[in-house]
């Protein structure tokens, strides 16, 4: 189910979104038992099982038990391989698939590793995390980020994966039952949620060919359907000032990211052919 849906629903939605994406698979493609091998083949993966397909697909091969994925991610040997293909300003999305709980790593330890440990600079800050954690675990029903952690497990799971649930709730991720016999809807929901989250954030360039960027003159322009009459979203000081359409910087003095206000985000994500442009204003050379 996981292999089929990574190559099917997930890959199709991500590719159709026209996002500048990268997928990193942390799993073993070389198990002696074929049923346990995780091979992601074309169009997303490479023609040879377990190989990279730059610039969009990378596989870090390691046997993962049902309980140790967080600990192994934090292991220097494997994290360095993962980090080599991460981009500092890009939004990250984790998808955990297991019927067990994390041992010994807690959600708080994993989050601290990402924000202030070896992952610092790649996953955001405690004030604004640059990642979301989706969980396909032992919960008995699909759960939204706003719903509390459940202790009721689905039929074939060892437990409900409480640590993974904590990470999903913390970051606004989805939780789905690993016991489902068909993951199509699960990966469809997760892929769409990733596209929507990324669509509402734009990375700022370090410089402009036209000169020094004047951040007070930057405009965010939305074109309905990709060809309609453009609308310019106004700049607001911060998220709290979002009362209608608009956008704000993560750091007004030296922005690295532009985030759309909720109203504008909804407008853009509801438009399958939306075009959003960052128009730079310059001080001159």
Residue ranges and their predicted role:
Residues 1-252, 283-285:
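Divalent cation-coordinating acidic motifs and surrounding scaffolds
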